[in-house]
């Protein structure tokens, strides 16, 4: 076998786009079961409401924090069944990525990477509260991002012009 070296030098890869996950962590988790143990005798099916939010902030040069915030409320005719709040964060290093592609990464790809962990944590928390696991449906982060940017574009186009 010949002694060919297939490793790329640092000079060859320094200009290529690089994205890496530095850390993932629960920043805040709260499970409330305010009507236990009576809630386990209730016969009505609860109505479940899920609210979802994505937040980002720069932490250092080329490092961004992405936060997935999920608020789940389950209510029945008799009262609150359970309430879960989760803030799950990821730290991402983004290097040599064009500026116009950073925001789409932070609002589409980063949440897509974090979502399976959020889903599992919520399912486990609800199950540990003695309820059937809550399995969130997959979320199309690209569609949400496009919808949000379209709404922002429409708002910026309808704002009255400044006075001269």
Swiss-Prot record:
One annotated GO molecular function? unfolded protein binding
- Say if the entry is tagged with keyword Cytoplasm: yes
Q: Which residues form the signal peptide?
A: none
* One Gene Ontology term, aspect cellular component: cytoplasm
The principal location of this protein is cytoplasm
Annotated GO biological process = protein folding; protein tetramerization; protein transport
Q: Where in the cell is it found?
A: Cytoplasm
Which cysteines are disulphide-bonded?
none
Q: Which Pfam families match?
A: SecB (PF02556)
Question: Keywords assigned by UniProt?
Answer: Chaperone, Cytoplasm, Protein transport, Translocation, Transport
Q: Which InterPro entries does the record cross-reference, listed alphabetically?
A: SecB, SecB-like_sf
Described by its record, this protein's role is as follows: One of the proteins required for the normal export of preproteins out of the cell cytoplasm. It is a molecular chaperone that binds to a subset of precursor proteins, maintaining them in a translocation-competent state. It also specifically binds to its receptor SecA.
Q: How does it assemble?
A: Homotetramer, a dimer of dimers. One homotetramer interacts with 1 SecA dimer.
Which family does the record claim for this protein?
Belongs to the SecB family.
NCBIfam families, alphabetically?
A: PRK05751.1-3 (NF004392), secB (TIGR00809)
Q: What is this protein called?
A: Protein-export protein SecB
Organism of origin: Zymomonas mobilis subsp. mobilis (strain ATCC 31821 / ZM4 / CP4)
> What is the gene name?
secB
């Amino acid at each position: 076998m010949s002694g060919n070296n297939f490793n790329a030098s640092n000079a060859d890869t320094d200009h290529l786009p690089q994205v890496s996950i530095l850390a993932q962590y629960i920043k805040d988790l709260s499970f409330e079961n305010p009507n236990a143990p009576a809630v386990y005798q209730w016969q009505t099916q609860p109505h479940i409401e899920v609210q979802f939010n994505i937040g980002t902030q720069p932490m250092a040069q080329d490092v961004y924090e992405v936060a997935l915030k999920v608020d789940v409320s389950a209510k029945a005719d008799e009262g609150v069944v359970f309430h879960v709040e989760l803030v799950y964060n990821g730290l991402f290093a983004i290097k040599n990525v064009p500026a116009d592609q950073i925001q789409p990464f932070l609002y589409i790809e980063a949440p897509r990477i974090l979502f399976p962990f959020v889903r599992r944590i919520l399912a486990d928390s609800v199950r540990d509260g003695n309820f059937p696991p809550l399995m969130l449906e997959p979320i199309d982060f690209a569609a949400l991002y496009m919808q949000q940017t379209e709404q922002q574009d429409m708002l910026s186009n309808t704002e009255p012009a400044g006075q001269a």
